[in-house]
Design a protein with these regions (language model features):
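Histidine-centered catalytic micro-motifs
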Residues: 87-97, 140-148, 199-202
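N-terminal non-globular leader segments, chiefly Sec-dependent signal peptides
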Residues: 4-12, 195-198
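Catalytic core of the metallo-beta-lactamase
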Residues: 10-75, 79-84, 119-185
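Glycine-rich nucleotide phosphate-binding loop and flanking beta-alpha elements
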Residues: 68, 95, 116, 204-205
Length: 239
């Protein structure tokens, strides 16, 4: 696996566009810590970050992507570590769940909306806590404009994996945030002990939580009175 990536990005960056050369590479392994690695995202086909948390007995995999070589990559690390795989799916979009049918897993956790697409595994309706010697995990529901029924994964109270939960929704030709949901997200992040959050398709993958909160607060400040939706345009999207 690749060398440790930097954790101290000062500002949140925009989603990489299709011309970014990093997205034209094959997905590869990168390390965050000695227990936390991930497979990089791709654009063609669109494939999300695949995170792997190594516990005492299992490899906890958050999202499985859509790129065709990811199941083989996960099978190889499972074999090397001698540990079975447990999967958490952030939400139902294909770039996050398409490979689930090609992966051998012990358990599969997802929101109710995601289950409508997979028809397998367990629906998470309340927090799931995993308490091991070196790894402490919490799987919990995260409100989202982008995808109803999203799940987040908190790792050792330091890293919170959010998938696409903080991104806007697309309603017809409009890109929008639900103002009420956005406020809930900001409040959840502020109460969370973790100093870092991880958003799919972003670079760097690990972001300072406070930078992300500031980004969301700029969007929330654009809301109009008595309007449930915040319209995003090319002119008002904050950096």
């Amino acid at each position: 696996m690749a060398a440790d990536m930097r954790e101290n990005s000062a500002e949140i960056t925009k989603i990489q566009d299709v011309d970014n050369s990093n997205n034209k590479q094959f997905p590869t392994w990168k390390c965050v810590t000695d227990y936390f690695s991930y497979i990089t995202p791709a654009i063609k086909p669109l494939s999300a970050n695949v995170s792997v948390i190594e516990g005492e007995k299992y490899l906890w995999v958050y999202d499985v992507g859509s790129y065709e070589n990811i199941p083989e990559m996960l099978a190889e690390i499972s074999k090397q570590k001698g540990k079975k795989i447990k999967i958490i799916l952030s939400h139902f979009h294909p770039d996050h769940i398409a490979n689930v049918q090609h992966i051998k897993w012990e358990s599969l956790y997802q929101g109710k909306n995601t289950y409508k697409y997979t028809h397998i595994g367990e629906i998470v309706e309340s927090d799931i806590n995993v308490d091991e010697t070196d790894i402490k995990l919490r799987i919990f529901q995260m409100p989202s404009s982008h995808a109803k029924g999203s799940l987040a994964l908190l790792v050792n109270n330091k890293y919170c994996l959010l998938g696409d939960a903080l991104y806007p929704a697309h309603k017809g030709d409009k890109t929008v945030y639900n103002a009420g949901i956005l406020k809930q997200q900001i409040d959840i992040l502020k109460k969370m002990a973790a100093p870092y959050v991880l958003l799919s398709h972003r670079e760097p993958f690990v972001q300072k939580k406070q930078a992300v909160i500031s980004w969301l607060e700029k969007i929330y400040a654009m809301r109009e009175k008595n309007e449930p939706w915040i319209l995003m345009t090319g002119q008002n999207v904050p950096n």
